[in-house]
Amino acid sequence: MYNVEKKQYEKIDIKYKFLLGVQNKNNNSEKEYLNLLKTIIKENNIKISRNSKVYSKFGVRMEFNLLDGFPLLTTKKMPWKTILRELIWFINGETDNKILNNKKVHIWDLNSTKEFLESRNLSYEIEGDLGPIYGFQWRHCGAEYIDCDTDYKNKGVDQLKYVINEIKTNPSSRRIIMSSWNPIDIPKM
């Protein structure tokens, strides 16, 4: 597991409870997800987003107990290494898609092209710059976003560090909250 404070990986014992491409009948998180999909399709609530038609349901909440294993879908093949690389990229507070590309991760490619950035009137038109997305909000919430090449060390609120500290020192706190969304930054994303 990645240790944020030491900025290195540490070996921990993780029990994986999934099979790629095979449905696991004891996977409660997957059952919850699939039931949600059935409900959304049955209700047929279609919205038009900026990219396509989307089936949606407002205000849905799903809860996963990580002691039961990582809630990875087993009804379809999931790129496990890609998921981990993207997560580590978020944990590091990165916003430069070229870092992911160097690791053969292409999830964000369409959102970082020059054409996309220009279509959104984004001023930091460095190709590959994704703006103040999830990882930036986790590690530098409230900092003024300039571009993906700027050093944001000790700028903004490090929500991830705060949440980890609270879990360790005050686990019953109702203030253990981390948000990936800062309303002020949404137009820059």
Question: Which positions does each model-derived feature cover?
Answer:
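Terminal, non-catalytic protein-protein interaction segments that mediate quaternary/complex assembly
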Residues: 2-189
